[in-house]
């Protein structure tokens, strides 16, 4: 229970039609980001407003169609480049991105 503490307060969704979901979120004023190795470095994005985050599968990532529907694409730089490891697993990537969102929002409210 304690390891999933934030899950009780963080809206997480698995949807049948991601394209339609992205369109609806954008209509409601939500800025939709996806994570991809070809994106803008995470810290260069303003993550303080209402946002949704799209994470792809560990094998194939986010599809090109979904990337085109998103408002922005974020990239997580690897600390240990040249080690043969070129990406984080999806749960680690989510944790890093959520931490940056929280950090930016805390700094904005300080």
What are these regions (language model features)?
Residues 1-6, 64, 68-110:
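Structured adenosyl-cofactor binding patch, chiefly the S-adenosyl-L-methionine
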Residues 38-40, 58-61, 79-82:
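Short Gly/Pro-enriched loop/turn and capping motifs at secondary-structure junctions
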Residues 27-29, 47-49, 69:
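Short loop/turn elements that form and flank the Walker-type P-loop nucleotide-binding site
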Residues 1-44:
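RNA substrate-binding interface of SAM-dependent RNA methyltransferases
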Residues 43-45, 63-66:
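Short glycine-/acidic-enriched loop or helix-start segments at secondary-structure transitions
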Residues 16, 49, 57, 83-88:
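Residues at secondary-structure transition points
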């Amino acid at each position: 229970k304690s390891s999933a503490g934030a899950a009780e307060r963080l809206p997480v969704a698995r949807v049948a039609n991601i394209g339609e979901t992205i369109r609806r979120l954008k209509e409601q004023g939500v800025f939709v980001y996806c994570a991809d190795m070809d994106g803008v470095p995470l810290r260069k994005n303003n993550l303080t407003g209402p946002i949704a985050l799209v994470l792809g599968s560990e094998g194939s990532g986010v599809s090109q169609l979904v990337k085109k529907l998103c408002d922005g694409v974020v990239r997580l730089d690897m600390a240990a480049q040249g080690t043969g490891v070129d990406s984080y697993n999806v749960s680690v990537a989510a944790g890093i991105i959520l931490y940056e969102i929280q950090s930016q929002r805390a700094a904005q409210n300080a």
